[in-house]
A protein has these predicted regions:
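Short hydrophobic/aromatic segments of transmembrane alpha-helices and their interfaces
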Residues: 7-8, 62, 147, 298-299
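Active-site-proximal beta-alpha loop/turn segments in soluble metabolic enzymes
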Residues: 169-178, 207-215
Length: 346
């Protein structure tokens, strides 16, 4: 039912836009593009909890993400996009389809581009572009669930001169999967700079994560996050570091009746080096303290390393090893994974 509703809504939205624009079938297709992106892997997972094998241990094939996007340009100022997101949900043991993007864009100038609807948020997609290996693993803040990549709201971005850019968003706070209305809006922003091959950025978030609703549970705490990134991106190699510090960054903490605060922080170091036009070595290491106040002994240490193969335009493969270890007093969860990851773009 949810899949049919999402797909039907997307189709109806584009049909209505087509009618409003008054464009002929030929001119409509001339100004419309369809794109796709798939992240998939075939791997073996060895997951243990306090020394005992646990799910999802085993060998298998996964499609982590499948995006289908439709872009239409009405004129030099206005355009629109609808992008669906296919993924597997372990909660219901089934696949689901969401609208990741559904927006109308107005480009007033390079310094001001406004989008209304669901679209990329300021931080995670920016870091993904710098990192370069999203199909292998999420970026630091996304992997640790203190940030997400898209949400519903009002978004603005632009370039300021030759070196600076910005992005800001006033959003519902529940993420793109849940467009529910809330009493107030959350806010996320980023200011970035690029000098030759050096990239620097700072960002932040504040809000109730979509939990502040009329007649709902009280939300005494406010989720906040501060982000920073510095990276060198050259012709053959790149190296960078990402950092975050977050307070009360979960729905449970925002609604905590005891008004108990919790803090988290972490960093990621990543890099890659292109050996030949086809093969590239890459890797990253992360360390996170996910609950510095309530569970100060808890620590998450993660790394991956691999070699990627650019098969042809739009198709890449990577042989990868991953290790993720979460420890606290008396407990240890370890996840080791090895396999082949792929990204397909068109």
């Amino acid at each position: 039912m949810k899949k049919s509703l999402v797909i039907g809504t997307a189709a109806a939205a584009f049909a209505m836009v087509a009618i409003v624009s008054g464009a002929s079938a030929q001119s409509w297709t001339d100004s419309t593009t369809v794109s796709g992106r798939m992240y998939a892997d075939f791997s073996n997972i060895d997951n243990t909890v306090d020394g005992v094998e646990a799910a999802p241990s085993g060998t298998g094939f996964d499609i982590k993400r499948l995006y289908i996007g439709v872009d239409h340009k009405f004129n030099e100022m206005f355009s629109a996009n609808v992008t669906t997101d296919f993924q597997y949900s372990s909660t219901i043991s089934s696949t689901e389809v969401y609208l990741k993007k559904a927006y109308l864009q107005a480009k007033f100038s390079d310094a001001l581009v406004v989008r209304v609807g669901a679209t990329d948020l300021p931080w995670v997609p920016y870091v993904e572009d710098i990192y370069g290996y999203r199909y292998v693993e999420n970026t630091l803040a996304d992997r640790t669930k203190v940030a997400t990549s898209a949400d519903w709201g009002l978004h603005a971005a632009g370039k300021l001169g030759g070196n600076f850019s910005y992005a800001v968003a006033a959003i519902n706070g529940n993420g793109y999967k849940n467009p529910s209305r809330t009493k107030g809006m959350d806010f996320e922003g980023r200011l970035s700079a690029k000098f030759d091959q050096w990239n620097f950025a700072v960002g932040g978030y504040t809000g109730k994560l979509g939990q502040e609703v009329a007649g709902g549970v009280a939300t005494p705490n406010t989720a906040t996050r501060v982000d920073a990134l510095a990276a060198y991106v050259g012709d053959r190699g790149r190296i960078g570091v990402e950092y975050f510090s977050a307070n009360d960054y979960s729905a449970a903490l925002v609604k905590n009746p005891a008004n108990v605060d919790d803090k988290a922080d972490g960093y990621s170091v990543f890099g890659s080096y292109r050996l030949t036009p086809t093969y590239t070595l890459f890797g990253k290491a992360e360390e996170v303290k996910p609950s510095k106040t309530l569970t100060p002994s808890k620590k998450d240490q993660y790394y991956n390393a691999g070699v990627s193969f650019a098969a042809f335009k739009g198709v890449s493969f990577a042989a990868v090893i991953k290790h993720d270890e979460v420890t606290s007093i008396g407990h240890k969860t370890t996840n080791n994974e090895v396999g082949i990851w792929t990204e397909v773009r068109y």
